[in-house]
């Protein structure tokens, strides 16, 4: 069965999704000329869902009713694998912008689509770059528009969670936005960092109660709280 699926993945699913990805990027680029909030989200949402379906990956969502669609949030999630992106894009159910590395914009077509969609490009190399990132975020995060961040900064190599960087929590506290921890479980088994081969399976997104901004909170405290909450819903062999 593994060999049959591998033939299906590389000879059928991957070529279809390559074409679909280019079409989605082009639709996003053109659509964002007219309405960035709509065309920067919905084409990619359905692209991500189709990507999961065609690769026989099921996404189960728990706790999404905790989210108010009129509120802007900072969503933070652990980063198990590439399918975290498809799971969040397709099944978050809330319009958002990614906080992503600026280098992604160098990818032909896809990079242009990300820029046109208004995703927040992170440049941490200079103080001015950080100020520009915060200014861009401030312009976007209102009226229910949210942001999604992987605080680890990269996919795990082992399945275990890495340390959290503070950027997302600094942003949340500075702008007074609630932070929503999301536990992603199953993505590492579907496609870990070390391979491009997909293993069909189930990914679970678990939404936790929003953590409201409090003036007494510091960045390290909120970061630690979110990491603890996210980790508690992971299997024991995925905890550090």
Where would I find each of the regions flagged by the language model?
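Non-catalytic C-terminal accessory region of glycerolipid acyltransferases
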Residues: 4, 131-240
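Active-site phosphate/pyrophosphate- and oxyanion-stabilizing loops and adjacent acidic/basic residues
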Residues: 49, 86, 169-170
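Generic alpha-helical secondary structure signal
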Residues: 17, 21-25, 108-115, 198, ...
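A generic structural signal for well-ordered alpha-helical segments
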Residues: 51-52, 114, 140, 172
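Catalytic core of membrane glycerolipid acyltransferases/transacylases, capturing the structured
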Residues: 24-45, 53-56, 62, 68-127
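Membrane-interfacial terminal anchoring regions of lipid-handling membrane enzymes
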Residues: 1-29, 42, 65-67, 221-240
């Amino acid at each position: 069965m593994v060999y049959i699926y591998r033939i299906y993945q590389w000879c059928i699913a991957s070529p279809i999704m390559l074409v679909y990805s280019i079409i989605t990027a082009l639709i996003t680029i053109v659509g964002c000329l007219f309405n960035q909030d709509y065309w920067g989200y919905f084409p990619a949402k359905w692209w991500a869902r189709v990507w999961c379906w065609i690769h026989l990956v099921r996404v189960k969502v728990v706790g999404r009713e905790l989210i108010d669609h009129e509120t802007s949030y900072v969503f933070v999630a652990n980063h198990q694998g590439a399918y975290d992106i498809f799971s969040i894009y397709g099944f978050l159910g809330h319009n958002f912008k990614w906080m992503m590395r600026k280098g992604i914009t160098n990818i032909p077509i896809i990079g242009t689509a990300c820029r046109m969609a208004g995703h927040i490009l992170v440049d941490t190399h200079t103080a001015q770059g950080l100020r520009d990132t915060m200014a861009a975020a401030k312009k976007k995060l209102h009226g229910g528009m949210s942001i999604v961040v992987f605080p680890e900064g990269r996919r795990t190599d082992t399945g275990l969670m890495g340390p959290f960087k503070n950027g997302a929590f600094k942003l949340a506290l500075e702008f007074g936005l609630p932070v929503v921890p999301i536990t992603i479980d199953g993505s590492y088994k579907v496609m870990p960092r070390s391979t491009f081969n997909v293993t069909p399976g189930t990914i679970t997104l678990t939404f936790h109660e929003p953590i409201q901004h409090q003036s007494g909170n510091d960045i390290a405290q909120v970061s630690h709280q979110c990491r603890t909450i996210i980790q508690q819903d992971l299997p024991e062999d995925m905890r550090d």
